[in-house]
Amino acid sequence: MRALCLLCWAVLLNLVRACPEPCDCGEKYGFQIADCAYRDLEGVPPGFPANVTTLSLSANRLPGLPEGAFREVPLLQSLWLAHNEIRSVAIGALAPLSHLKSLDLSHNLLSEFAWSDLHNLSALQLLKMDSNELAFIPRDAFSSLSALRSLQLNHNRLHALAEGTFAPLTALSHLQINDNPFDCTCGIVWFKTWALASAVSIPEQDNIACTTPHVLKGIPLGRLPPLPCSAPSVQLSYQPSQDGAELRPGFVLALHCDVDGQPVPQLHWHIHTPGGTVEIASPNVGTDGRALPGALATSGQPRFQAFANGSLLIPDFGKLEEGTYSCLATNELGSAESSVNVALATPGEGGEDAVGHKFHGKAVEGKGCYTVDNEVQPSGPEDNVVIIYLSRAGPPEAAIAADGRPAQQFSGILLLGQSLLVLSFFYF
């Protein structure tokens, strides 16, 4: 019994033990307060009572918040850190404070912030991050803050906002976001629409204005004129050649990704083959098929050649190049993707007999199937598989090399769902 009493006393003493020497601690209005403001501190002092619910470290010289900075005070409900020199907040610095309702980081030098820590602060009602150097907010930064009522982001360096950033803030009643250098391109149009329709109080709307482009500088977002904006769209087609490229002799598979959207989307190719996945930021070659500076290639011509016009060439197509070919277009308004599965077979593996039984040629201008002059595009879910059948033909009399040598012809059939594409290539 005596041991139990001693243990209880030890716990009580821990809860009410003195504050760190520079700070004052006490109870006020039912809250356990630790006041360390204006103490010229350069770090969070250790030794706080575990029952502290309000901690003020405002007006000090804190340069940053390390991981576990507030591990001693897990019951904190209010944390005041304004007017310091905080440049960064490490991941894990704030995450343990699951009871936090008010967080003030205003008037610092914040350029890096542990946005993921906010996911654990679901009780937060007030978040002040104004007067910092923040240039970017992740789309999911506030995804767990359904109780947040007031958010202050004014006087930062924000130039863009990801669409849907404020959608999780269902309790939000006050948003201050003025005096940021917004880039008034298509990516900001959603915020104008949201702000005009929202019941959230947004003060100083005349100071929520464009900084770029120059022609729109100073115009408030609420009076932003209509912009020619559209989300990306893609159409993947299959062609036996592309404009202006110098092709090597041999069989070449050519795909073309027709991209539309405003602003002009960025095009990427995602290629999944038996040997692994290849990611290509288009273009990676010039019009001569040679690798551009900075493109990864072990020789003058990469295995997969992505051209600026949206074409993708695969020289010497073979079994190792079988797989799924996807083109992905992305701009500020979203992304779009189209894919095709490509498989290579020989006539001995089904050949023309399989063609006749499984697929039917589509007549085009009296022809029984598509020719090299026709571009084929998938018309439905069944048209997303390309099977290439190769055969060798004798040298045609009309195909003669510059030095008089006859050319060898390689013929092929591309099966595109319900369509056929007959290809002929000449090897000199």
Curated annotation (Swiss-Prot):
LRR repeats mapped onto the chain: 51-72, 75-98, 99-122, 123-144, 147-168
UniProt-listed InterPro entries: Cys-rich_flank_reg_C, Ig-like_dom, Ig-like_dom_sf, Ig-like_fold, Ig_sub2, Leu-rich_rpt, Leu-rich_rpt_typical-subtyp, LRR_dom_sf
Tissue: Detected in thyroid, heart, retina and spinal cord.
Signal peptide: 1-18
Domain LRRNT: from-to ranges: 19-50
Entry-listed glycosylation sites: 51, 309
Keyword Cell division appears in the UniProt entry: no
Cystines in this chain: 257-327
Domain Ig-like: 232-343
Pfam families per UniProt: LRR_8
Stated name of the protein: Immunoglobulin superfamily containing leucine-rich repeat protein
Organism: Mus musculus (Mouse)
Primary gene name: Islr
